[in-house]
Amino acid sequence: MAQEVIKIRGGRTLNGEVNISGAKNSAVAIIPATLLAQGHVKLEGLPQISDVKTLVSLLEDLNIKASLNGMELEVDTTEIQNAALPNNKVESLRASYYMMGAMLGRFKKCVIGLPGGCPLGPRPIDQHIKGFKALGAEIDESSTTSMKIEAKELKGAHIFLDMVSVGATINIMLAAVYATGQTVIENAAKEPEVVDVANFLTSMGANIKGAGTSTIKINGVKELHGSEYQVIPDRIEAGTYMCIAAACGENVILNNIVPKHVETLTAKFSELGVNVDVRDERIRINNNAPYQFVDIKTLVYPGFATDLQQPITPLLFMANGPSFVTDTIYPERFKHVEELKRMGANIEVDEGTATIKPSTLHGAEVYASDLRAGACLIIAGLIAEGVTTIYNVKHIYRGYTDIVEHLKALGADIWTETV
């Protein structure tokens, strides 16, 4: 069966500007949240990625009128109807689990296929289920392909998450906005995307306090009205392009950035010795290799993002000594390592820590196992000698708007082929 691949001839120096898209991890929660509205919602600044299109299609399966035009989505929930959501769409992306919280909040029941997405090792949704049960829901998990969630009534509850989880924090918020009384989420995730979803819900009339802290309080309301809302910029896309610019940029400017959201990466760049100039909503970066070797440990926000440990890895081949990367969030998130070895990388993984030594990369055929691994391989291809061919590019398109076109515009020798 024919498939698209990305090909890169490495060694080009990049120059120019990139406008960063809206945040994927906000958009994939805010789109399901629109079904909580009574009426019309308009979203602006959405990333143009496949996950967004899939979620819009799921809204349409609930008889919601949804019109996606570039970065704008208009939604009309006037004729909404509850329905079992098909497994083939749901299993294509993990963020479909936000339909659970939103549908539970709106209808008090939902039947939904089990969520998919990137295979990153164990990623249970037990904290989501714990939250739903605390609000009064009963969960039927007897099926191997779908889940039934139902509540006679949703009542506010005090919920302590056993681990910090962005998905669980948001999903509980979605279910709790229509619950009777107050819901308190302790040990809540503090990520900017959590704040963005809370701000969107508040713009529709929800009563939410404390988003961005470890304690979020939601006072249930009877109705949410329509709203117009602009999604925040994508800090992971911004971080990825920062890594690209540091790897092979001469003068690259990134626009539409919230500097505070990427300050952990900016600080790590200072350790590495990357030239970074931050101004308001734009960042200018250029390659200043060889870099200093560093240690990186992923943590929950505001720590170093797990989504950036793969994209920053190719930079570490350009350092003057061995670097160490430990992923405490997803210890199995190292499927990119074997692919980098095909390119001649001197890299080993032991018990959740990668040891990365200075290496000269050469072009090879490699496979993107997940979204951020794909970004890592693109950066590796940009600095490698010769031509790199990347397979499984569907993962890359799930999270990056027009990445091939953006890189071409910067001067990269990159193209797609059908093989």
Swiss-Prot record:
Pathway: Cell wall biogenesis; peptidoglycan biosynthesis. Cell wall formation. Adds enolpyruvyl to UDP-N-acetylglucosamine. The lineage of its organism: Bacteria, Bacillati, Bacillota, Bacilli, Bacillales. The modification 2-(S-cysteinyl)pyruvic acid O-phosphothioketal is found at residue 118. Pfam families: EPSP_synthase. NCBIfam families: murA, PRK09369.1, PRK12830.1. The keyword DNA damage does not apply. It is found in: Cytoplasm. Belongs to the EPSP synthase family. MurA subfamily. The gene is murA2. This is UDP-N-acetylglucosamine 1-carboxyvinyltransferase 2. Keywords: Cell cycle, Cell division, Cell shape, Cell wall biogenesis/degradation, Cytoplasm, Peptidoglycan synthesis, Pyruvate, Transferase. It catalyses: phosphoenolpyruvate + UDP-N-acetyl-alpha-D-glucosamine = UDP-N-acetyl-3-O-(1-carboxyvinyl)-alpha-D-glucosamine + phosphate.
